[in-house]
């Protein structure tokens, strides 16, 4: 009682898949504040490091953009070495007084690595080369795992179909899908 509650921001499903040396990362476009849709076509992914890395974010947009800028600086500082840049960002994110207050997660793919970077200092490399973050991530992840295991679909097709499935289930995910490929 007496405490102001901040509106819960839920706005994203981001999914990345690597298959046969090709990587794809996509997201829906919905941004919500509480139970209201604010925007249908928010762009939550971008290409980094001379087009060799794609990243997407879930969480507060301003926080995520700040983290993306920092991640890009780390990639430049470490010559595009994805894991090293991710670990250094996670370390800074966790220990810096300003950064540790940022509320976002990053999903990152290159042609041979898929990582999730969190503000708690985690850098997670899933065993199946699928990364998923955001409100509908578990629906998209389940769909992607099944499609990867049981179909010959490309990475891009798996991302597209899985995000469509998540959009059919998760009220915080829509079907305005943007996908980038490597």
Swiss-Prot record:
**Sequence similarity:** Belongs to the peptidase T1B family. HslV subfamily.
Gene Ontology, cellular component aspect: HslUV protease complex; proteasome core complex
Q: Which organism is it from?
A: Chlorobium limicola (strain DSM 245 / NBRC 103803 / 6330)
Name by which UniProt lists this protein: ATP-dependent protease subunit HslV
Binding-site residues for Na(+), renumbered to this chain: 167, 170, 173
Report whether Cytoplasm shows up as a keyword of the record: yes
* GO terms assigned for molecular function: metal ion binding; threonine-type endopeptidase activity
Q: What general EC class does the enzyme of this chain belong to? A: hydrolase
Q: Where in the cell is it found?
A: Cytoplasm
**InterPro entries annotated for this entry?**
ATP-dep_Prtase_HsIV_su (IPR022281), Ntn_hydrolases_N (IPR029055), Proteasome_sua/b (IPR001353), Proteasome_suB-type (IPR023333)
């Amino acid at each position: 009682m007496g405490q102001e509650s901040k509106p819960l921001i839920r706005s994203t499903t981001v999914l990345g898949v690597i298959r046969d040396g090709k990587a794809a990362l996509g997201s829906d476009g919905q941004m919500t504040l509480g139970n209201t849709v604010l925007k249908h076509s928010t762009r939550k992914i971008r290409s980094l490091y001379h087009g060799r890395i794609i990243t997407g974010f879930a969480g507060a947009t301003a926080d995520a953009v700040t983290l993306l800028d920092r991640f890009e600086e780390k990639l430049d500082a470490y010559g595009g070495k994805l894991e090293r840049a991710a670990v250094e960002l996670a370390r800074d994110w966790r220990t810096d007084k300003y950064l540790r207050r940022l509320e976002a997660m990053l999903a990152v793919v290159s042609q041979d690595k898929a990582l999730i970077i969190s503000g708690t200092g985690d850098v997670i490399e899933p065993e199946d080369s699928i990364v998923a973050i955001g409100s509908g991530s578990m629906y998209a992840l389940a769909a992607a795992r099944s499609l990867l295991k049981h179909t010959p679909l490309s990475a891009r097709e798996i991302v597209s179909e899985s995000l469509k499935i998540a959009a059919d289930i998760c009220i915080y995910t829509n079907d305005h899908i943007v996908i980038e490929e490597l």
